[in-house]
Amino acid sequence: MAYRKPSDLDGFIQQMPKADMRVKVQLAEDLVTFLSDDTNSIVCTDMGFLIDGLMPWLTGSHFKIAQKSLEAFSELIKRLGSDFNAYTATVLPHVIDRLGDSRDTVREKAQLLLRDLMEHRVLPPQALIDKLATSCFKHKNAKVREEFLQTIVNALHEYGTQQLSVRVYIPPVCALLGDPTVNVREAAIQTLVEIYKHVGDRLRPDLRRMDDVPASKLAMLEQKFDQVKQEGLLLPSALKNTNGNGVGLDEADNIGLRERPTRMIKRPLHSAVSSSLRPKPNVNDVTGDAGAVTMESFESSFEVVPQLNIFHAKDMDDIYKQVLVIISDKNADWEKRVDALKKIRALLILSYHTQPQFVAVQLKELSLSFVDILKEELRSQVIREACITIAYMSKTLRNKLDAFCWSILEHLINLIQNSAKVIASASTIALKYIIKYTHAPKLLKIYTDTLNQSKSKDIRSTLCELMVLLFEEWQTKALERNATVLRDTLKKSIGDADCDARRHSRYAYWAFRRHFPELADQIYGTLDIAAQRALEREREGGGGGGTGTGTGTAPETRRTVSRIGRTPGTLQKPTPSMRSISAVDTAAAQRAKVRAQYTLYSRQRKPLGPNNSNQASMTGAAASGSLPRPRLNSNSGGTPATTPGSVTPRPRGRAGVSQSQPGSRSTSPSTKLRDQYGGIGNYYRGATGAIPKKASGIPRSTASSRETSPTRSGGGLMKRSMYSTGAGSRRTPERNNPVRPSAAARLLAQSREAEHTLGVGDDGQPDYVSGDYMRSGGMRMGRKLMGRDESDDIDSEASSVCSERSFDSSYTRGNKSNYSLSGSHTRLDWSTQRAPFDDIETIIQFCASTHWSERKDGLISLTQYLADGKELTQQQLKCVLDMFRKMFMDTHTKVYSLFLDTVTELILVHANELHEWLFILLTRLFNKLGTDLLNSMHSKIWKTLQVVHEYFPTQLQLKELFRIISDSTQTPTTKTRIAILRFLTDLANTYCKSSDFPSDQSQACERTVLKLAQLAADQKSMELRSQARSCLVALYNLNTPQMTLLLADLPKVYQDSARSCIHSHMRRQSQSCNSGANSPSSSPLSSSSPKPLQSPSVGPFASLQSHHHQLSISSTSPRSRQSSVEQELLFSSELDIQHNIQKTSEEIRHCFGGQYQTALAPNGFNGHLQYHDQGQQDSCASLSSNSKTQSSANTTQSNTPESATMRLDNLERERTTQNAKSPTDDAKVITVSINMAENGELILASNLMESEVVRVALTLTKDQPVELLQTSLTNLGICIKGGNCELPNKHFRSIMRMLLNILEAEHTDVVIAGLHVLSKIMRSNKMRHNWMHFLELILLKIIQCYQHSKEALRDIDSMIPRIAPSLPLDLSINIVNPVIATGEFPTNLCAIKILLEVTEHHGSEITDAHLDIVFPNLARSADDTQSMVRKAAVFCIVKLYFVLGEEKVKPKLSVLNPSKVRLLNVYIEKQRNCISGGGSSTKNSSAASSS
């Protein structure tokens, strides 16, 4: 087709619609040439026609034509100037799309067009960037995002910060640091660097305040900023506006700063920099969306309605019918429909909804019409008016609108994604009104289903935002039915692909947590580490828009604001690489360091405690492994902190091997000292200053070895080399398992600091129970110096403990022992040096790191954290377990070795909470044993499995082992099978009782026995075959009847094979028995696995142990079945036991020397409820003076709640139980025989010393037998009431920890016994100076126990009047007042009763200020839904009335309703008559306290 070049614009406009591509290309070139020539006139018929003709070129698929169209627009902008502004709204969106073109030339022309718009004043730079930002920051095309960042940089360079405010763009730019595209991330970094050049150091704090900036990115940006500053690239605007940030610059710096011309710069080439971390962007809209409606516009429109002429109720019906017809007619004029929707609001304003048929009939009719509008209406004004009407209906009708909302909700949600902003925003606000006012549980299903299934990110993001409002506005009761669905939905949305949805979901999580803390913990435990950190940041930052507030139920441990960095990469760094051993004389360097440290230490050392005089190798408060130590700062007297520039020689001797050389001790422990953060030694520094590593696996001679052996270390007593706490102590498996119910968490939220204080120790005093008894209340007891009480030669330099090789086999689990340092004869207090990190969240971050050195530091710190007696919260524990699942197959040997230490420590602390994790633990350890390992690693895994044996219930272990063996989906290796069978054999032989064997004949048992029989006939591996046969025999020995039944169900072939194995073993055993000592057996195979008697054999009553009353040992000791000889010894002593019972009971009953009498009140409650029980019991408690040594004989005990050699048998149990069950018997006079020793100690019945009572009490936990707990607590109460309280004061914190644990028990009698002891403590003036520091914790714990049971409630009711005289007024009011205000029944009732009794006993001290504090809450309680709370509040107000007088209280009564005031007047009059009649004013108060 012939082409003729046009001569004017009208000619170009006429030819533009032509379809010939060649013509278009030529026409486009000619048009650009025409427009670029200033001599050519641009006058035409209509410039709009030219713009309309260029638009298809711009949006077409031909890149050359699109490029020419951009050039043509640029030329038009130059010619028209500001007149082009009329066309920017049409052109700009398509220019944005061309920014993402695949051709570089097209993108460049688009950039030039944007520059021309700013340069020729078509749009101011700020206005143009704002318009672009609304869509470019979140544009789906990565090229658009990248080019827009370049546009910001160009504009900034061209116009500077005077015309362009960049602060508003920083958050969305930071969000792009986590963009999936590498080029966008690089462009974002470059953009921030360019912004820094203009604004200077003001940018740094803004970036640090943004939690969504990954720490690695922040560190990179800081480095680039520093580089820019050092190179003098900062512009004058940055230096002028620093406002003091640049004060550090000297003249030379200023000279180096040069002005740079503000000109357009070429875009730098992108280099592929990978980013491994994806942030959670917190992108806020830069500007408001044009056309969007707001909540204010809704509110102002609610009552903008037409006036209705209503004269009769029928008129309203007529109007309603007209409205219904109009809004249902799709063909009606849209203005009429808008007016009809307004009339609906007008009818509601006139209370039309009060008519009975409105909700039942007319709302249903309206819902159908509204569904049609929301589904099919195209007019935005109609939909907007419908949304306003829906919002007003929800605000007016509230829950009556539930059926209506259920009908329209799904369609209303679908409008969120509408491209028209007015529709999307109106529907969103209508949804907010529905959530705020219509609390209908049936609506939640639609919310959650849509959120889970919607593919629109706008819908998901908005619904996540609405979830925050949902959890803030709705009551817990309305959410309970759908709690699990909400949990699953919230969990999914936290991991949503859209950043805004994730952000709102994190806010919603903390709001959800206030309703369901347990379910929130479940969500937290399933998240990965990054998501958990993001959650914590939202909580710390307070969230956005008031939605991210934290709650009292969240984890206590918070990261500090000033902490450096956020991830392991930016936290504490390890020291530089060590010098070679050949570089310096390492021995001299180390000895010099030791001398310097000791010199510093000797200036600060404290005298030894009274109980540590024998422990010469320990100093100060560190004499016992579990005692509190002064936390010395490394900069204030302790070991000086190592500077980054310092280096420390690193000896290259094999770990754990003493390599003495002629004339040298360079590898003795004194040369193993390390820097503060010098690697693995940080963990063990608290013990020895040396580095006790695992064995290297290199064969070594033991002929001249100084390695510890069981016959030398610990006084010749057997102990576990790795996890034992020393020859004189035994870490027991029973421990305080803190229960954290939501109610308790809410009640005790204010007292966590007090509970934390309890974990510090007894004011630095040595605790004589430390190292001998188990930890209680979260404080670890059970670390003492190895063998200090047994042997004095352990301090000698030649002793086994001092040798380096002994570390591998004798270091304690907590590593709190101090060893002699060879060559110097000095000892340092290594407790001043800590693990790399103390903050648990930092530790968890490091453990989750991908770098092995950071994981190592994290594991070291976590091990030390647990070893210090601290416990993890439920959230932290779940997070740690999730990380550990990945660490089980860690390929780095050093990290895995530390990991096993940490796992062991975790088991020791949290065994009771790891039952569900046991299957994973065993499976992973067995799989690891199936790989090729060093001998040292192999033995270490088995040591961990030994701890599993001892700290998990044997029945649970059997169940999980059967599950592992019978799992047909797994095909373990031969080595793995051998490890499993060996573990099972050891368990059955050593730890199980016959009752532990599953008795339900489950399929798992049958498959397990079948599998064992198959493996016992395996022909490939002799070792596997032998181990399988041993396992069969062990199980048969464990429970012969059950195994016989299981074997009978096997196929004939395997049945014969298994029986042959068992019979052959029986024959061997019978032969060995015939050749040895003949002893009767209790089962055919009782001698096949000899199990030594594990119960202690010390103390005067050790042999008087009935098989029914083995409270301290037999119920949990690691014996499966004792031989008949042992059983006969026990049975033969039954007569002696009964004789002793009767004799001791008679002595207690008839002995009157040194007695004190306690009369029980008629109701049986005066704080000594159990005396009449325990007075008839033989408290056979005997801890011999050398019990430390004797208890060490049982270091291999397992599953025992007590390791102390203690006997507390409850005699005449039936009588005790009967008495305990009837505490309201008639008044009885109880006599308890006590005497006083020369040293001031009490001597109770059966010569039980007060020190023994306290010692035993400190070992109590809530899971021990009820009779034992009652006996021990009763004895402790006697000592507190009748003694001088010297010992209870000395160990007050340990006693408090024990009592707090006891009060968590499930058994009511145990809780009551604990409350009695607590009552005596609070009534003891001698202990007042101690318990006053923990008053808040004590009162809140009492209030918490009030909801335990009816018996506990009655006991507390009788306890409150007795402790009230001792309570301080101000502090007590401050504690109970918040509980009265916010507590739930019955905790608020208990708080009111405490306030009533305090008012009764401290009436003269009450002031107007006190009345102002408590009266508003009492007034609200007077209208409580619970009648008992109302009654107690009324009695309390009456008491205040008489204490403070009518003139002060009566004005306050105005807040009460008239009926309540009349009721108060009745009670006041009755009280006044009672007082005038000579009655006591306490009667009514007592009635209130018992109501």
Swiss-Prot record:
Residues recorded with modification Phosphothreonine: 648
Comp. bias intervals (Gly residues): 542-551
Biased composition (Polar residues): 569-580, 632-646, 657-671, 699-712
Tissue and organ distribution: Expressed in testis and ovary.
Chain intervals with Low complexity compositional bias: 1070-1097, 1111-1124, 1181-1200
Keyword Cell cycle: yes
GO terms classed as biological process: attachment of mitotic spindle microtubules to kinetochore; axon guidance; cystoblast division; establishment of mitotic spindle localization; hemocyte migration; mitotic cell cycle; mitotic sister chromatid segregation; mitotic spindle assembly
Protein keywords: Cell cycle, Cell division, Cell projection, Cytoplasm, Cytoskeleton, Developmental protein, Differentiation, Microtubule, Mitosis, Nucleus, Oogenesis, Phosphoprotein, Repeat
GO molecular function, one term: microtubule binding
UniProt cross-references to SMART domains, sorted A to Z: TOG
Keyword tRNA processing on entry: no
HEAT repeat extents: 44-82, 85-123, 163-201, 402-440, 874-912, 955-993, 1289-1327, 1408-1446
Pfam families, per database record: CEP104-like_TOG, CLASP_N, XMAP215_CLASP_TOG
Phosphoserine, modified sites: 582, 626, 634, 806, 817, 820, 822, 824, 1120, 1123-1124
Record's GO cellular component terms: basal cortex; centrosome; chromosome, centromeric region; cleavage furrow; contractile ring; cytoplasm; cytoplasmic microtubule; fusome
Positions of region (Disordered): 537-586, 600-739, 1065-1127, 1167-1205
Localisation per UniProt entry: Cytoplasm, Cytoskeleton; Nucleus; Cytoplasm, Cytoskeleton, Microtubule organizing center, Centrosome; Cytoplasm, Cytoskeleton, Spindle
Major subcellular location class: cytoplasm
InterPro entries reported in the protein's UniProt record: ARM-like, ARM-type_fold, CLASP_N_dom, HEAT_type_2, TOG, XMAP215_CLASP_TOG
Record function comment: Microtubule plus-end tracking protein that promotes the stabilization of dynamic microtubules. Required for several aspects of mitotic spindle formation including the formation of the overlapping central spindle microtubules and kinetochore attachment. Required for the incorporation of tubulin subunits at the plus ends of kinetochore microtubules during poleward microtubule flux. Acts antagonistically to Klp10A and Klp67A to maintain metaphase spindle length. Also required for guidance of CNS axons downstream of Abl.
Protein family membership: Belongs to the CLASP family.
PANTHER family, alphabetized: CLASP, CLIP-ASSOCIATING PROTEIN
Assembly behavior: Interacts with CLIP-190 and microtubules.
The protein's name: CLIP-associating protein
Source organism phylogeny: Eukaryota, Metazoa, Ecdysozoa, Arthropoda, Hexapoda
Gene: chb
